[in-house]
């Protein structure tokens, strides 16, 4: 478990407070210390989301002072993954230097064709240079070119000041909509997904409001065409009607960039899964690790089987400080996954995502068989992992 910085900030200062006073900052420190004392493995930042997006770099460093010199990791969805992604990484290198504690950049990527094959190599180079200077910074990646998050993430982050109910109310205002549209048509100072990849690559994957669920699995461009609207109007109408409770799957990244990240010796693999109770899952919920093994190891030969397994086990355990996980050795937890690489197959797809992978037939958790001959044994030996 990680302590969520956004939740901590919202508890201390509300959802839409850009500037923090001394009492609010002190409460953030207290809550971080409380979560770490309870066993949190680290602190997770979402700088691309409200309310974390309201931190300046200086205020962020101040908020994270309880982690200074601790060796406790900070994981981060950076402030940008689009045209400003390299500068966003530089910001996190600055944070890592100031706090002298590890930073793990979550799901590293470069969004948009204009940034593919250009920003990712630069970021890998910058992290390597920082490590040579003694800075602990690395990254993880998921093996899919599509991401998934809340649909409001296509809007400028300042639109979420006050929370989603306030945003829903504001979307009823034509002037507010027009201002959003103007920002989204040209803005490069935020992760402007609609500009970078187009509405045809932004799919509404789950919608809370039942009478709108006919649009699940359709792109915003397709919804707009059906409704006879422009894509901005269709987007704003959908968000307003659903009280902003809509998730998306967005096709944003380049497979060659994923290969470059996987080849980096310091990267890990992440599923970055979310679990909506309605609509369409992202196939990574079921298929991340077999996609890595089947597609990137066996088919593309982007990395060796040994390296791939290490990124999912030993490397990941080291990053999170899990001292009894990740390797096979006396005294370690006996967590084993036995598979034949030639038989591994990802069954989950974007159109049919809730499908178990094939080939993962024997799994032990804490030395007890959880899956034998491909069937669940009923054993539930897993425990909550704490620091």
Please name every model-derived segment.
Residues 1-22, 26-50, 64, 94-97, ...:
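Active-site neighborhoods of metal-dependent hydrolases
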Residues 39, 77, 140, 228, ...:
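Divalent metal-coordination and catalytic microenvironments
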Residues 52-55, 80-86, 113-116:
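Acidic-and-aromatic substrate-binding clefts and catalytic sites of carbohydrate-active enzymes
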Residues 54-59, 117-119, 249, 283-284, ...:
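Short glycine/threonine-rich loop-to-helix capping motif typified by GTGT followed
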Residues 61-72, 76:
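Alpha-helix-loop-beta-strand connector modules within alpha/beta enzyme cores
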Residues 246-252, 256-258, 304-309, 317-354:
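Acidic, glycine-enriched loop/beta-strand segments at the rims
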């Amino acid at each position: 478990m990680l302590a969520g910085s956004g939740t901590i900030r919202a508890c201390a200062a509300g959802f839409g407070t850009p500037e923090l006073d001394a009492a609010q900052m002190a409460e953030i420190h207290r809550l971080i210390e409380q979560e770490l004392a309870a066993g949190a493995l680290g602190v997770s930042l979402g700088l691309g989301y409200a309310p974390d997006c309201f931190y300046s770099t200086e205020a962020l460093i101040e908020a994270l002072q309880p982690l200074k010199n601790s060796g406790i990791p900070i994981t981060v969805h950076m402030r940008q993954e689009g045209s400003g992604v390299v500068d966003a990484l530089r910001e996190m290198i600055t944070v890592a230097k100031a706090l002298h504690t590890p930073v793990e950049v979550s799901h590293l990527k470069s969004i948009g064709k204009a940034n593919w094959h250009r920003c990712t190599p630069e970021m890998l180079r910058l992290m390597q240079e920082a490590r040579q200077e003694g800075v602990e910074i690395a990254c993880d990646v998921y093996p899919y070119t599509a991401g998934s998050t809340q649909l409001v993430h296509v809007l400028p982050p300042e639109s979420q000041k006050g929370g989603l109910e306030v945003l829903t109310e504001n979307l009823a205002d034509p002037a507010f909509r027009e201002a959003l549209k103007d920002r989204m048509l040209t803005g490069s100072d935020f992760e402007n997904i609609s500009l970078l990849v187009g509405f045809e690559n932004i799919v509404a994957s789950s919608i809370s409001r039942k009478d709108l669920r006919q649009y699940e699995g359709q792109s915003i461009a397709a919804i707009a065409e059906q409704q006879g609207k422009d894509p901005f109007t269709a987007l704003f109408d959908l968000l307003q009607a659903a009280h902003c409770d809509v998730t998306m799957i967005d096709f944003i990244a380049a497979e060659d960039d994923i290969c470059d990240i996987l080849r980096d010796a310091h990267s890990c693999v992440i599923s970055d899964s979310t679990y909506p109770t309605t609509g369409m899952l992202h196939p990574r919920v079921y298929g991340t690790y077999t996609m890595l093994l089947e597609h990137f190891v066996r088919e593309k030969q982007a990395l060796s089987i040994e390296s791939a397994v290490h990124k999912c086990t030993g490397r990941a355990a080291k990053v999170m400080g899990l001292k009894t996980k990740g390797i096979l050795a006396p005294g370690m937890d006996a967590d084993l996954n036995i598979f034949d690489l030639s038989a591994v197959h990802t069954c989950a797809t974007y159109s049919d995502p809730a499908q178990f992978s094939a080939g993962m037939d024997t799994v032990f958790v804490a030395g007890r068989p959880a899956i034998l001959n491909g069937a669940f044994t009923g054993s539930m030996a897993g425990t909550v992992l704490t620091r």
